[in-house]
Amino acid sequence: KSTLINRIIKHKVSIVSDKAQTTRNRILCIHTDDECQIVFLDTPGIHKPKHKLGEFMDEAAYQSLRDIDVVLFLISGNEKKGPGDLFVLDKLKDVGVPVFLIINKVDLMTKEEILHKITEYAELYPFAQVIPISALKGDNVDAVVDELRKILPEGPKYFPDDMITDQPERLLVAEIVREKLFRCTRDEVPHAIAVYVEEMKDRGHNKVYIRVTVYVERDSQKRIVIGKNGTVLKEVGNLARQEIENLLGSSVYLDIWVKVKRDWRNKSGALSELGYKNE
């Protein structure tokens, strides 16, 4: 989902990972061109939650189904239909708005496989549109915008032309660090990670100091995040700093600390402190 949104917006506003449930917050993203303005809500993936964080993520996704005009239901075309897909489609039965089926990763499929996938899903739900794409390569992504432009109701322009997201800089910085941690760690460790920007200070002369705390649930996870002689954390810091500098247009000193906050994903107070709270 996030790869598609970033491709449409033409900026990186959502972090990307091949791991499930990467997106935790609802992210508002804005596409503006000469003909229209389309507001997208990049939601956490709907799933059966295993902890309070998962419940928060599901609620954020369900809240996004209110006051919308179209749903984009995105699947990986090269993967078999699973119970998760059927679970989400069942939840969409009463949504009351058109649903587009977006078949992603068609660059990895034959024409016959694409046609079979379209037929398979058409039997499950009355989709308003079916659009095969490759979000990574950008193939047919323009068709998504074109079809949305046709079906969306006219309304006022809610945001300035140069605005692409409602996310504050601090949250964007935290998400960049979390994305790099996803890339550099393994197994279940990424899902036990939370990132919080403690301090973000302009020191003048185009230099910004940022202090970030990475929270994990166990001491063993802390050791993995830091790495032998700090190698993992150093790599995360270097990758994140480069992207944050591009985001802010400033030289950045990134100070990353790792702390253990035991079982934070199951504690409402900890979730709220870390910014995971629904409106």
Describe every region a protein language model picked out.
Residues 1-59, 63-65:
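Conserved G1/Walker A P-loop phosphate-binding module
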Residues 4, 27, 42, 61, ...:
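Residue-level signature of catalytic and energy-coupling elements of molecular machines
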Residues 7, 11, 30-34, 49, ...:
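Conserved, well-folded catalytic cores of nucleic-acid-processing
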Residues 20-22, 44-47, 77-81, 106-109, ...:
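Conserved nucleotide-binding/hydrolysis micro-motifs of P-loop NTPases
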Residues 21-24, 54, 58, 65, ...:
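Amphipathic alpha-helical transducer elements in NTP-driven molecular machines
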Residues 32-37, 56-130, 201-204:
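Conserved C-terminal guanine-recognition region of P-loop GTPase G domains, centered on the G4
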Residues 97-98, 107-165, 169:
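Canonical P-loop GTPase G-domain recognition
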Residues 169-279:
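P-loop NTP-binding site
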